[in-house]
Design a protein with these regions (language model features):
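FMN-binding flavodoxin-like domain, especially the glycine-rich phosphate-binding loop
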Residues: 1-2, 6-14, 20-32, 37, ...
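Short low-complexity, flexible loop/linker segments enriched in glycine and/or proline
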Residues: 41-42, 121-123, 220-222, 248-252
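Residue-level preference for short coil/turn positions at secondary-structure junctions
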Residues: 42-44, 73-74, 179, 185, ...
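Conserved short-loop catalytic and cofactor-binding motifs
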Residues: 50, 82, 128, 186-187, ...
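A mid-sequence, solvent-exposed acidic-amphipathic segment
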Residues: 159-191, 197
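Iron-sulfur cluster-binding cysteine motifs and their immediate structural context
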Residues: 184-185, 190-212, 216-218, 222-239
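Long, positively charged, glycine-interspersed low-complexity recognition regions
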Residues: 230-255
């Protein structure tokens, strides 16, 4: 089974491609996490977990869900992580998670996809994003080849920098940066509730037709990037930046 969590659908796209290539079922962790569903999942022997990279590891909400949820029938697990640039030493923590779940760790693969973390970085415009997705195809094909053969992924890079970013920096990043406090709406907001719908942690509700953010945010960027009116800002850091979600690339090419 292919499990995935996603913010702006990079991971959903990769998971769908992998599931199609392996003829495996696809399992949406966003829906489970949003519903608070930790019931056992019948996965079969092989599990592929596809996630974005948050602070140089898999998202904390995913590792927490995995810790609470029995993967019935699972014996082996592969991790596929998409990122804007690097995953650090995420593989070391994925190995620990596999051991915790008593699963054979089959490796971690990194695939570069378009950046969406506009709370800190710049997202590409659609034309550039399409190019990045095209450039990701060889890496995706290598992942599929290994998975079809039941082989381990090659060990990723691991150096002092990687261990530092995934190690001490990760909890510091969550503590000081992963907060919803800076989210706000502009006058363009129409109160459609798309942000409420997309938030995997139920951290947004409408008051007087306007979104209000709570304290339980994972910085997935779904709210700000899916807003149809681009009426959400993250303080001053997102002003003027392109919004990115994968579905926009599947529409008619930009004129």
């Amino acid at each position: 089974m292919v499990l995935y969590f996603t913010g702006t659908s990079n991971s959903r796209y990769l998971a769908r491609r992998i599931a199609e290539g392996l003829e495996m079922p696809l399992y949406d962790l966003n829906a489970c996490i949003k519903a608070g569903d930790t019931a056992p999942v019948q996965t079969g022997q092989d599990v592929v977990l596809v996630t974005p990279t948050y602070a140089w590891r898999i998202p904390r909400v995913v590792s927490e869900w995995m810790s609470k949820t029995a993967l019935t029938g699972a014996e082996r697990i592969w991790f596929v992580m998409d990122c804007g640039s690097e995953i650090g030493n995420a593989a070391g923590y994925n190995r620990q998670l596999a051991a915790q779940k008593q699963l054979q760790y089959m490796g971690t693969a990194q695939i570069i996809m378009p950046e969406n973390y506009i709370a800190m970085f710049n997202a590409p415009r659609n034309e550039q994003a399409r190019s990045i997705v095209e450039q990701a195809e060889p890496a995706l094909q290598k992942v599929l080849t290994r998975l079809k053969a039941g082989q381990q992924f090659p060990a990723p890079r691991e150096n002092l920098y990687d261990r530092f970013m995934s190690g001490p920096v990760n909890p510091v990043f969550y503590r000081f940066f992963v907060k919803a406090d800076a989210f706000r709406t502009t006058e363009a907001c129409i109160g459609c509730g798309k942000c409420v719908e997309m938030c995997p942690l139920n951290n947004i509700h409408l008051e007087n037709g306007k979104p209000v953010w709570g304290k339980n945010c994972t910085h997935c960027m779904a709210c700000i990037c899916y807003c149809p009116k681009e009426a959400i800002e993250y303080g001053k850091k997102s002003k003027g930046k392109p919004r990115y979600h994968f579905e926009a690339l599947e529409r008619k090419q930009d004129v």
